[in-house]
């Protein structure tokens, strides 16, 4: 009888060890808050609202990174079985990258005011050539093809203060005509200047993200001229006023630019938009506010629900009130939508895409990739990497995993800053890097 008991004990002990190993595989709560030294492909993290510290638990840090030339031998690090190549270099602030149905990659070079198109055969580690598709643009950022699908007729480009479109046929390397203004006036001026674009799955709605004019409604009056109640009765749930009116929002338009509606509010800087193929839901990644401490509040990725209010400026991550605006909109506390995936504070997520390719291992399909531009308001540097959001049956688990790291040179300097991600025609992943003026390509080789 002793042998079966011994075997049972060993099985129980083994199961306990396996459970412990599984628990340690994902860094949860405070353990998920590290710095660049703890980053490595495969490291998983999960944050919840219950993990957040109190406002001011640490001093607000001013810790910007110095951008340096890529050191000799430095290269992005990907998981085992993946190979990283320099797809394109010598770009001027490459930001958003979007891939046309024929495989051409369109990149917004925001500082240069142009959109550049790169061509490459499937499987090619490097772009074969590049052409300027359109120039003379006002800080272009978002790019979208319309109608969605195999045969788009237009390329839409979001400038900082308007949306334009160009006629397009597959293979065009230069716009066939001048820019046609679709949305003549987006909220612009101070604060976040990037504007991203996405079309609904059926192509009937054009979504435009507009970031806030300030960190936490710094210049917004305490109340609108007509009073809060009267203003709220005529505007979307959680709408801001003054210099922040129609900012920190996702706006919705008809494809021709008419029919403007506020789709969702309280998204401080929804810098990247994407449609989830499995559910047709709109997703965005959000840079949350600064100056509340090293680990507060988390940035996030979330599905964007019509009519939802995500908290800014009065609240963050549900009904957690910003102490700088205490009591100003207590009526909204129970109406805040909690985002789906929390990301370490100050990581600065800028771009998001869902993996619908066939090149990566099967468990990647349906997951999302997010480009983290990197922190400045944190004593210990974080971000500066690409992470993978884990989904199960189309729903986020709340976990995310380091996928592409290695862009930090040391405590003071970085040589790369990921901005956006896109799935190439052959299933590889393209990553823009505005610090290095580059586009990186990550391919699965199995070796």
Language model feature labels by segment:
Residues 97, 143, 197, 270-273, ...:
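Hydrophobic core register within WD40 beta-propeller blades
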Residues 114-148:
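Blade-loop segments of beta-propeller domains
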Residues 86-91, 132-136, 182-189, 262-266, ...:
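Surface loop/turn motifs at the tips and blade-to-blade linkers of beta-strand repeat domains
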Residues 105-107, 153-157, 205-208, 282-284, ...:
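Hydrophobic beta-strand segments that make up the repeating blades of beta-propeller
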Residues 139-140, 161-200, 228, 232-235:
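Asp-box/WD-like beta-propeller blade repeats and closely related beta-sheet repeat scaffolds
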């Amino acid at each position: 009888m002793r042998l079966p008991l011994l075997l049972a004990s060993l099985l129980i002990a083994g199961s306990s060890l396996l459970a412990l190993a599984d628990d340690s595989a994902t860094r949860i709560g405070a353990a998920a808050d590290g710095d660049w030294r703890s980053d490595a492909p495969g490291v998983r993290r999960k944050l919840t609202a219950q993990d957040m510290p109190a406002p001011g638990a640490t001093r607000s840090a001013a810790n910007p990174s110095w951008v340096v030339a890529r050191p000799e031998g430095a290269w992005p690090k990907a998981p085992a079985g993946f190979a990283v190549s320099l797809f394109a270099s010598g770009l001027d602030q490459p930001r958003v990258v979007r891939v046309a149905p024929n495989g051409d990659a369109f990149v917004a070079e925001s500082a240069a005011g142009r959109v550049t198109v790169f061509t490459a055969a499937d499987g090619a580690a490097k772009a074969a050539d590049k052409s300027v598709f359109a120039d003379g643009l006002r800080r272009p950022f978002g790019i979208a093809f319309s109608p969605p699908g195999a045969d788009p007729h237009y390329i839409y480009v979001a400038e900082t203060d308007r949306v334009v479109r160009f006629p397009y046929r597959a293979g065009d390397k230069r716009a066939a005509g001048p820019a046609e203004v679709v949305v003549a006036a987006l909220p612009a001026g101070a604060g976040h200047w990037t504007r991203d674009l996405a079309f609904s799955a059926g192509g009937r709605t054009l979504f435009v993200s507009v970031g806030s004019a300030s960190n936490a409604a710094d210049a917004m009056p305490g109340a609108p001229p007509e009073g809060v109640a009267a203003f709220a009765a005529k505007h979307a749930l959680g709408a801001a006023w003054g210099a922040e009116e129609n900012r920190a929002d996702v706006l919705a338009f008809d494809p021709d630019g008419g029919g403007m509606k506020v789709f969702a509010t309280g998204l401080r800087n929804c810098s990247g938009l994407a449609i989830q193929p499995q559910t047709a839901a709109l997703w965005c990644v959000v840079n949350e506010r600064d100056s509340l401490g090293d680990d507060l509040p988390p940035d996030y990725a979330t599905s964007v629900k019509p009519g939802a209010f995500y908290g800014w400026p009065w609240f963050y991550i549900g009904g957690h009130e910003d102490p700088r605006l205490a009591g100003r909109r207590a009526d909204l506390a129970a109406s805040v939508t909690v985002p789906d995936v929390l990301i370490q504070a100050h990581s600065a997520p800028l771009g998001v895409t869902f993996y619908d390719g066939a090149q990566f291992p099967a468990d990647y399909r349906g997951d999302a990739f997010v480009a983290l531009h990197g922190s400045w308001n944190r004593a210990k540097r974080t971000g500066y990497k690409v992470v993978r959001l884990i989904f199960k049956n189309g729903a986020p688990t709340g976990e995310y995993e380091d996928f592409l790291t290695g862009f930090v040179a040391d405590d003071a300097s970085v040589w790369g800053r990921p901005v956006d991600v896109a799935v190439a025609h052959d299933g590889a992943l393209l990553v823009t890097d505005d610090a290095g003026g580059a586009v990186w390509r990550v391919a699965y080789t199995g070796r």
